[in-house]
């Protein structure tokens, strides 16, 4: 089987802040501006997509895994509306300090550990060495680096601690998902500077 390259999308980095915060409130999250066009550029370059995130609400007794499956379907529907298919969504339900004993464990899938990405790669035939992670926290960046991916940090103000180390240094920093897509395509030698200039204007990217 030929392994595919993918872009792992940290859930908080692709939707309007707060939209996907609750598993049980029934809201459909909204994509950030320029996310749809950026993802379509990556889709056209042959990338698969997989959403990841920590969901400790299960361990804390605030939701269950059925509700996480509902969240996953919301993300799938949201991206389908933009013409982008997901291989799936992977959420870590654990929290070492949770109240549900079966989920209050020190697991290998809670970001910044790489277990979510590694499991998705096994289940969906993804090549981690040729894949990228886009996230807006250094814990997400660290998970990508540990898994062997290249990474883009979205500088949207969510990261406040800035505890840097070799594992927490992104390959690129972008102002939004549209710019992140262009940076990835440049690194993959899919995009030259002429197309970058045209697509930057279409995606609302300030530089380029």
Please provide the spans of the model-predicted regions.
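Short, solvent-exposed loop/turn segments at secondary-structure boundaries
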Residues: 26-27, 61-66, 104-105
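Substrate-recognition element of Asp-dependent hydrolases with the DxDx(T/V) motif
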Residues: 35, 39-78, 82-98, 144
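Conserved Lys-Pro-Asp/Glu-containing loop-to-beta segment of HAD-superfamily phosphomonoesterases
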Residues: 108-138
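Asp-based phosphoryl-transfer active-site loop
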Residues: 3-19, 53
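Short, basic, low-complexity termini and linkers enriched in Ser/Thr/Gly/Pro
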Residues: 202-208
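Acidic, Mg2+-coordinating phosphoryl-transfer loop and its flanking beta/alpha structural elements
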Residues: 132-172
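Short acidic-hydrophobic, aromatic-tinged amphipathic segments that line or gate anion-handling sites
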Residues: 171-180
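Basic, amphipathic juxtamembrane/active-site segments
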Residues: 20-37
């Amino acid at each position: 089987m030929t392994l595919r390259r993918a872009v792992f999308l940290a859930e908080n980095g692709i939707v309007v802040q707060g939209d996907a915060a609750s598993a049980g409130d029934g809201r459909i999250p909204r994509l950030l501006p320029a996310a749809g066009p950026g993802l379509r550029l990556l889709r056209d370059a042959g990338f698969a997509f997989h959403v990841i995130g920590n969901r400790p609400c299960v361990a804390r007794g605030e939701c269950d895994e059925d509700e996480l499956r509902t969240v996953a379907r919301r993300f799938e529907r949201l991206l389908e509306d933009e013409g982008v298919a997901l291989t799936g969504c992977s959420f870590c339900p654990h929290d070492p300090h949770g109240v549900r004993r079966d989920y209050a464990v020190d697991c290998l899938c809670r970001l910044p550990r790489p277990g979510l990405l590694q499991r998705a790669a096994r289940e969906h035939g993804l090549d981690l060495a040729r894949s990228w992670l886009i996230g807006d926290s250094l814990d997400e960046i660290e998970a990508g680096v540990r898994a062997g991916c290249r990474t883009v940090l979205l500088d949207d103000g969510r990261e406040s601690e800035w505890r840097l180390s070799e594992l927490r240094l992104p390959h690129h920093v972008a102002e939004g998902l549209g710019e992140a897509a262009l940076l990835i395509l440049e690194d993959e030698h899919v995009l030259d500077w002429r197309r970058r200039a045209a697509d930057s204007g279409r995606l609302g990217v300030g530089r380029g």
